[in-house]
Amino acid sequence: VASTGMLGQIIPPSIALVLLGDVMSNAYQRAQNNMGVFSQETVSVGDLFVGAIVPGVMIVTGYLIYTVIINRKKEFMPIEEIEGEADILKTLLPPATLIFVVLGSIIAGIATPTEAAGVGAFGALIIAGLNGSANLELLRATSYKAATVTTMIFSILIGASIFSLIFRGVGGDLLVDQIFEMMPGGKYTALLFILLAIFLFGFILDFIEICYVIIPLVAPPLLMMGFDPVWLGILMAINLQTSFLTPPFGFSLFYLRGVADENIKTIDIYKGVIPFIIIQLLILLMVVLFPFMIL
């Protein structure tokens, strides 16, 4: 449950990819400026959405295979017959249609992520109204939650911008560039070092903090080495998703601990997610070795 609940961080439409798209676009423009390229290209959120489809499907497939294998050995899940297919379809069709419209409009270039998000919010409100679950109290609580999350993100963004400005002012970005250039083994050693660093930071930091503080510092030097921005963005997105499962501060683990039975120990939750972390790291390695899956 904890692992599959975090698939939304890599499978479009994903808030992590939306945030990462903005960060990678800025990093790519900065890298092009440093290389003297003034007819610049950008990285769109739609590009990341398209690039994340194959890795997302691979992660889901890996989860399914592992779940089937472990269930056959220990028989965790009882077999139940599915009844009421029409009711299931009726429940799934409206949100699936809304996701298709929102995601399709971004990938097709019809709407920006902000415009598509507005359509998605309005569509979700209509669906809630048709289901009879919409009321003023729910709307108030939802608006408050959205405002809280938005405030948190912008607070981190403002702090990260100040940090980045000071860091560049004292020449920190030049130091990072020099460190990358002096690394033995070339650009792939630098890439593996950064991916490992992001993975370790995921044990203690939220993905938003990594996205706005760490990635803007390390992405431009990597892009100047010739890496494709979309491919690099997907690698970092998979890495960021893994941070939700890494103890002790994996947010997915906290959520599961809050709703799980008291008889389930925290250490058992930590042990249970290890195979899923390994699956994600294997998929990450495959994307590194076979970039054509993204490009």
Where are these regions (language model features)?
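Alpha-helical transmembrane segments of multi-pass membrane transport proteins
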Residues: 1-295
